[in-house]
Curated annotation (Swiss-Prot):
Gene3D superfamilies: Aldolase class I. This is Dihydroorotate dehydrogenase (quinone). GO terms for biological process: 'de novo' pyrimidine nucleobase biosynthetic process; 'de novo' UMP biosynthetic process. Its cofactor is FMN. Substrate binds at residues 66, 111-115, 172, 177, 246-247. It comes from the Bacteria. The keyword Ion transport does not apply. It is found in: Cell membrane. Monomer. PROSITE patterns: DHODEHASE_1, DHODEHASE_2. The keyword Oxidoreductase applies. NCBIfam families: PRK05286.1-1, PRK05286.1-2, PRK05286.1-4, PRK05286.2-5, pyrD_sub2.
């Protein structure tokens, strides 16, 4: 009830202004009596994935808390893990506004943020301040002005800085809003990137005396042979996990709806079936070699269960959280 009232107010605002205001308030309210508006008890449902123990299998997807400002607030909502970022080596402002749009009839969102963030050093400081006792994933990307052929350097810089503070590291090569980024998902470019990341992981594990898993985040807009190729590269390079999927460029299910023609990645309910199908095909090709984190259009316990039945061991929410609030976390944990 409280969230429905808050949502009715926030949805009167520009989508990005509402997002920024929510982040500011979460940051301000945590640890005060006002956090009772979103704090809830979610029963433990432990699961071990990538060698990590998670309190429950429901996580916050990257993109909502880009700079790690509200980790403790999301922890209070009962998330079993929180993925912050995407973060880049240097701060960047992202694409021009407006760049976030609600597709209300479809419970979808279209964004073309472009990795706006305050830089990896700022995020690390926020992670260090957090009192959250769950798993913190850190999602890393490349700066827009870094040439794609030098993109690996940005990922390695971020890995070096976040490694000690991350529960796992997510490698984002699938955002549609950074020019050329998705080209890193294919063929030799992917193999080359993954081999460099694996070598850096081994180096940092020896240096810090702990092993931090690597997970690759992929797009939904893939042909079947591309899914097969990605699975082969993941196994070959001994990557620890895969996150499926990011946002889609496909507009088939939202044609004619408000904002449907805006440039950017579409998330929410219209992505639900496609992301589940990618997970199913990945699971077939991986055959248990590494775990899958399922994300894309999860807005209920049933849609979370569909991802898990398709092969996901963990799930993440973003757009579903915007439309349904913290209650969705508890619903999924208790009923999926």
């Amino acid at each position: 009830m409280i969230y429905r009232l808050a949502r009715s107010v926030f949805f009167q605002l520009d989508a990005e202004k509402a997002h920024d205001l929510a982040i500011q308030n979460f940051s301000r309210f945590t640890g005060t009596p006002l956090d009772l508006f979103y704090r809830q008890h979610v029963p433990d449902r432990p699961v071990e994935v990538m060698g990590i123990k998670f309190k429950n299998p429901v996580g916050l997807a990257a993109g909502l808390d880009k700079n790690g400002e509200c980790i403790d607030a999301f922890g209070a909502m009962g998330f079993g893990f929180v993925e912050v970022g995407t973060v880049t080596p240097r701060p960047q402002s992202g694409n021009e506004k407006p760049r976030l749009f609600r597709v209300l009839p479809a419970e979808g969102l279209i964004n073309r943020f472009g990795f706006n963030n305050l830089g990896v050093d700022n995020l690390v400081e926020n992670v260090k301040k957090s009192k959250y006792d769950g798993v913190i994933g850190i999602n890393i990307g490349k700066n827009k002005d870094t040439p794609i052929e030098k993109g690996a350097e940005d990922y390695l810089i971020c890995m070096d800085k976040v490694y000690e503070h991350a529960g796992y590291i997510a490698v984002n090569i699938s955002s549609p809003n950074t020019p050329g980024l998705r080209s890193l998902q294919y063929g030799e470019a992917l193999d080359d990137l993954l081999s460099q990341l694996k070598a850096k992981q081994e180096e940092l594990a020896a240096k810090h005396g702990k092993y931090v898993p690597l997970a690759l985040k992929i797009a939904p807009d893939l042909e079947d042979h591309e899914i097969v190729q990605i699975a082969e590269s993941l196994i070959k390079n001994k990557i620890d996990g895969v996150i499926g999927t990011n946002t889609t460029l496909d507009r088939t299910l939202v044609k004619g709806m408000p904002h449907c023609d805006e440039m950017g990645g579409l998330s929410g309910r219209p992505l639900q079936n496609r992301s589940t199908e990618v997970i199913r095909r990945l699971a077939e090709e991986l055959n248990g070699a590494l775990p899958i984190i399922g994300v894309g259009g999860i807005d209920s316990a049933i849609s979370a269960r569909e991802k898990m039945n398709a092969g996901a061991q963990l799930v993440q929410i973003y757009s579903g959280f915007i439309y349904h609030g913290p209650k969705l976390v508890k619903d999924i944990v208790m009923n999926s």
